[in-house]
């Protein structure tokens, strides 16, 4: 079965059991291929996510003159060209659906000697980019967007960048990363502060590639003119992908699964804290470190969940996991309240609206607010769900179908391949009732 099918039929399967290996982390895979391309020397990447988004980023660096070998689906050998070795592309650089790729590349390309154009698919072409182009312009970059601040990004090369002290108005790891990457090329020091701490993948991996960077929660600082040294990276399993199985095992009676070597970046694991507030049974084991990132096995067993007020401080640390959390909330006893999550309205879809509408279609009462929702736990029924081409919405409702009193049809699931190729096959093997329709 392939994620490229048009829709899924999800219905009750069996309790989830066994040990599952989740594909590599998308955020780490993007950065690994990007930083390896900018490094001096040859880097080997193991556990690379073979998804559409990460393939787009790798293909862009190939267009920029970087040789990338693919010994296997989950490996890349990158022949770095150094920070000053990228070559002018012959045409537009297509980021596909990858907001991470586009925003981080904007920081890198802003400092090159050549012009470039970053484009994306229909979904990415609706996403806000001024949050990135604004601070880059403060550094001296020249980047044009559409009149509403959306892609394509037309990057004018040959600009001399200056380091800045930037207080980001949004808690966004992508904005922070774009500014820091431009800062590598800038004169002087570049520092970024955030209203709330965000994921520090960029900081950890730049350090792994030999860059001197000072960082702590909500703060990062580096000086320009540094070079990256090639290194080998082992990409951990993607926490956001694991999240769907964490939630599924928590709400499907009789379940007990182990998820191997999952990345547990402290700015990524808000979902674990939220689920534990709701009574989930999640145990961490075999802690280690892969490529500067903390990892552990997660043992998850079914537990009756109860509604909870989700602390706003957790929101930036679980921004991609809210679709899965909403399904957990629907299955819980009582009400779950989410606030401070307006960022969900400008993801691959308006995730607050999409999840609220979808859960209502299955009989769950949801009170939507501008920055969140109250989900009243109940019984999930049958219905037809529009995923709006959003991979995380699609996977969330595949879980919902496992508790449905009937069947859940999830439309437009092709984009699941952007982050989790093979999700449906892995889910079936674990016990999901899930089938594909053309």
Curated annotation (Swiss-Prot):
Keywords: Amino-acid biosynthesis, Aromatic amino acid biosynthesis, Cytoplasm, Transferase. 3-phosphoshikimate binds at residues 26-27, 31, 172, 174, 320, 347. Pathway: Metabolic intermediate biosynthesis; chorismate biosynthesis; chorismate from D-erythrose 4-phosphate and phosphoenolpyruvate: step 6/7. GO terms for cellular component: cytoplasm. Its EC number is 2.5.1.19. Phosphoenolpyruvate binds at residues 26, 99, 127, 174, 351, 392. It comes from the Bacteria. The active site is at residue 320. SUPFAM superfamilies: EPT/RTPC-like. Gene3D superfamilies: Enolpyruvate transferase domain. Monomer. This is 3-phosphoshikimate 1-carboxyvinyltransferase. It comes from Xanthomonas campestris pv. campestris (strain ATCC 33913 / DSM 3586 / NCPPB 528 / LMG 568 / P 25). The gene is aroA.
């Amino acid at each position: 079965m392939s994620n490229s099918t048009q829709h899924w039929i999800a219905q009750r399967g069996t309790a989830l059991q066994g040990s599952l290996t989740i594909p590599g982390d998308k955020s780490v895979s993007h950065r690994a291929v990007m930083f390896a391309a900018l490094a001096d020397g040859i880097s080997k990447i193991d556990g690379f996510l073979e998804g559409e988004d990460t393939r787009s980023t790798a293909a862009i660096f190939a267009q920029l003159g970087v040789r990338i070998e693919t010994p296997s689906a989950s490996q890349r050998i990158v022949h770095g060209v150094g920070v000053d070795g990228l070559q002018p592309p012959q045409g537009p650089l297509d980021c596909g659906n990858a907001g991470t790729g586009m925003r981080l590349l904007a920081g890198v390309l802003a400092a090159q000697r050549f012009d470039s154009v970053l484009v994306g698919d229909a979904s990415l072409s609706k996403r806000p980019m001024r949050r990135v182009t604004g601070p880059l312009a403060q550094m001296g970059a020249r980047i044009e967007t559409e009149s509403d601040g959306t892609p394509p990004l037309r990057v004018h090369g040959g600009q001399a960048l200056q380091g800045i002290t930037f207080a980001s108005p949004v808690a966004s790891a992508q904005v922070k990363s774009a500014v820091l990457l431009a800062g590598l090329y800038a004169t002087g020091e570049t520092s970024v502060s955030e209203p709330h701490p965000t994921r520090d993948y960029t900081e950890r991996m730049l350090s792994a590639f030999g860059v001197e960077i000072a960082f702590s929660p909500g703060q990062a600082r580096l000086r320009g003119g540094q070079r990256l040294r090639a290194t080998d990276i082992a990409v951990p399993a993607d926490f956001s992908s694991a999240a769907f199985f964490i939630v599924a095992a928590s709400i499907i009676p009789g379940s007990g699964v182990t998820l191997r070597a999952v990345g547990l970046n402290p700015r990524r694991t808000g979902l674990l804290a939220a689920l534990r507030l709701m009574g989930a049974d999640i145990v961490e084991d075999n802690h280690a470190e892969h490529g500067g990132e903390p990892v552990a096995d997660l043992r998850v067993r079914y537990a009756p969940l109860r509604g909870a007020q989700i602390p706003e401080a957790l929101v930036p640390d679980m921004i991609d996991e809210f679709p899965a959390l909403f399904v957990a909330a629907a299955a819980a006893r009582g009400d779950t309240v989410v606030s401070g999550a307006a960022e969900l309205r400008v993801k691959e879809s308006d995730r607050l609206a999409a999840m609220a509408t979808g859960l209502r279609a299955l009989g769950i009462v949801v009170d939507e607010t501008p920055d969140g929702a109250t989900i009243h736990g109940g019984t999930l029924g049958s219905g037809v769900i529009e995923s709006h081409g959003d991979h995380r919405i699609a996977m969330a409702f595949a879980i919902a179908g496992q508790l449905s009193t009937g069947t859940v049809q999830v439309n437009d699931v092709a984009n699941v391949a952007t982050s989790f190729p093979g999700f449906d096959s892995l889910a079936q093997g674990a016990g999901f009732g899930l089938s594909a329709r053309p």
